Amino acid sequence: MAITAQQVKELRQKTGAGMMDCKKALTETDGDMDKAIDLLREKGIAKAAKKADRIAAEGSTLIKTDGNKGVILEVNSETDFVAKNEGFKELLNTLADHLLANAPADLEEAMGQKMENGSTVEEYITSNVAKIGEKITLRRFAVISKEDSEAFGAYLHMGGRIGVLSVLSGTTDEDLAKDIAMHVAAVNPRYISRDQVSEEEANHERQILTQQALQEGKPENIVAKMVEGRLNKFFEEICLLDQAFVKNPDEKVKQVVAAKNASVKTYVRYEVGEGIEKRQENFAEEVMNQVKK
């Protein structure tokens, strides 16, 4: 039977698949819309499975809070273009809502949880891979709780390229908590305070700094003093409370929070794609890859 343009349009709207894929599916199923949808889903899922070896190093972070619970998550895509797609943004929001409401312990538990639409989180993501046409991955998330007497600070940089969720104790000042989150996004400290730095790491740095000072030919009687000074600078680079506050470098972060009788309880910072090695291919390698097939 002849397939009409209206049928193709309807199938595209229902599945998000390409025009030629829709026309082919309708032809193969003699114009049966439901069977065509099933066929495209089968092909879409197969297509999604074939994409599993791709590196998804773009994407976005998102933060949502509801009362005393908050969630920060990172979802990866293969291209920045898809990360700006409305369908991708809808997926990001839907996943955030689910994680916030259900608070799974880890990724494995999250992927197996049933959503309101009846599918598992994994099935929901896979169905969106078929529609969007790229590998999509829920990479990580953290669900954080606070007390009524504490404050959440949520900050997204560059539309979600970096996300930080902070918790301050001793204050309900959300503006201050957001300022701290903004600082963490900009400076990326590894620890809140010096007491979180292991003795092993501190001693290792001290040994390196000592050797540096001796190599510079400094007298041994002043090496120890120099090393402690440089070690303080090391702590300033990696510890949030010791850092100059980005909005007012004349003050340390610890002074800013202490002025409000507050303390930094915790923070989570996600930067899209950090730690993921993006595959770099040039034309010569592409030709070689084709030759080897």
Swiss-Prot record:
InterPro entries: EF-Ts_dimer_sf (IPR036402), Transl_elong_EFTs/EF1B (IPR001816), Transl_elong_EFTs/EF1B_dimer (IPR014039), Transl_elong_Ts_CS (IPR018101), UBA-like_sf (IPR009060). It is found in: Cytoplasm. One of its GO terms (molecular function) is translation elongation factor activity. Residues 79-82 are annotated as: Involved in Mg(2+) ion dislocation from EF-Tu. Pfam families: EF_TS (PF00889). Keywords: Cytoplasm, Elongation factor, Protein biosynthesis. One of its GO terms (cellular component) is cytoplasm. Associates with the EF-Tu.GDP complex and induces the exchange of GDP to GTP. It remains bound to the aminoacyl-tRNA.EF-Tu.GTP complex up to the GTP hydrolysis stage on the ribosome. Belongs to the EF-Ts family. This is Elongation factor Ts.
